[in-house]
Amino acid sequence: CDRRFSRSDELTRHIRIHTGQKPFQCRICMRNFSRSDHLTTHIRTHTGEKPFACDICGRKFARSDERKRHTKIHLRQKDKKVEKAASVSTTSSPVAAYSSSVATSYSSSIATTYPSPVRTVYSSPASSSYPSPAHTAFPSPSIATTYPSGTATFQTQVATSFPSPAVTNNFSSQVTSALSDMTSTFSPRTIEIC
């Protein structure tokens, strides 16, 4: 093949792929390997040696990739605890319901950080997050505060927009009653949208 290598040992290892040469043999079961590190890992299956220990629970593994895969189990457990704690705290605070995702890092001797996106929780559509007219702690602009006379302003806009008196009369009477109904039924934010 046309592959090039900067080191001769890499070239030698690669050539073994093409030739099928396996110069490293296990003395216990006579199995052959193309790389010495694969033989070393294989011998651990016979000796029971497990040099890689989990930093969290202490479980030991023969290969480092097995420990790395095992460590992810602990991280998923921590992520679930963080999500559960986040969902509990967001239900008590209306501001936290719109928080962005948070990256959490877990330190270990592996020297790797694992981001943990915290699920964003939104309040259900049934309970409105907009303040109702009864709440005075959350000032929200309404038609009454934005326009001193909401119905009069709307009537004059309709009258100037539509020169026909028939159209003006139809809209002004319906709008006046609709606005008074809206003011008593909906929150200020809903009136603004309408």
From Swiss-Prot:
Q: Where in the cell is it found?
A: Nucleus; Cytoplasm
Q: Can the keyword DNA-binding be found in this entry's annotation?
A: yes
A GO cellular-component term linked to this record: nucleoplasm
The UniProt annotation puts the region (Disordered) at: 66-88
Q: Name one GO molecular function term.
A: RNA polymerase II transcription regulatory region sequence-specific DNA binding
Keyword GTP-binding in annotation: no
- InterPro entries in UniProt: EGR1_C, Znf_C2H2_sf, Znf_C2H2_type
Query: Which keywords are on file for this protein?
Result: Activator, Biological rhythms, Cytoplasm, DNA-binding, Metal-binding, Nucleus, Repeat, Transcription, Transcription regulation, Zinc, Zinc-finger
Coiled-coil ranges from the UniProt annotation: none
Q: Which SUPFAM superfamilies does its entry note?
A: beta-beta-alpha zinc fingers
UniProt site positions, description: Interaction with DNA: R3, R7, R13, R31, R35, R59, R63, R69
Residue ranges covered by zinc fingers (C2H2-type): 1-18, 24-46, 52-74
Q: Which Pfam families match?
A: DUF3432, zf-C2H2
Q: Which GO terms describe its biological process?
A: cellular response to interleukin-8; circadian regulation of gene expression; interleukin-1-mediated signaling pathway; positive regulation of DNA-templated transcription; positive regulation of transcription by RNA polymerase II; regulation of protein sumoylation; transcription by RNA polymerase II
Q: Which PROSITE patterns match?
A: ZINC_FINGER_C2H2_1, ZINC_FINGER_C2H2_2
Describe the task this protein carries out. Transcriptional regulator. Recognizes and binds to the DNA sequence 5'-GCG(T/G)GGGCG-3'(EGR-site) in the promoter region of target genes. Binds double-stranded target DNA, irrespective of the cytosine methylation status. Regulates the transcription of numerous target genes, and thereby plays an important role in regulating the response to growth factors, DNA damage, and ischemia. Plays a role in the regulation of cell survival, proliferation and cell death. Mediates responses to ischemia and hypoxia; regulates the expression of proteins that are involved in inflammatory processes.
Q: Which family does it belong to?
A: Belongs to the EGR C2H2-type zinc-finger protein family.
What is written about domains in the entry's comments?
Binds to DNA motifs with the sequence 5'-GCG(T/G)GGGCG-3' via its C2H2-type zinc fingers. The first, most N-terminal zinc finger binds to the 3'-GCG motif, the middle zinc finger interacts with the central TGG motif, and the C-terminal zinc finger binds to the 5'-GCG motif. Binds double-stranded target DNA, irrespective of the cytosine methylation status. Has reduced affinity for target DNA where the cytosines have been oxidized to 5-hydroxymethylcytosine. Does not bind target DNA where the cytosines have been oxidized to 5-formylcytosine or 5-carboxylcytosine.
> What is the name attached to this protein's record?
Early growth response protein 1
**Lineage, top ranks:** Eukaryota, Metazoa, Chordata, Craniata, Vertebrata
UniProt lists the gene as EGR1
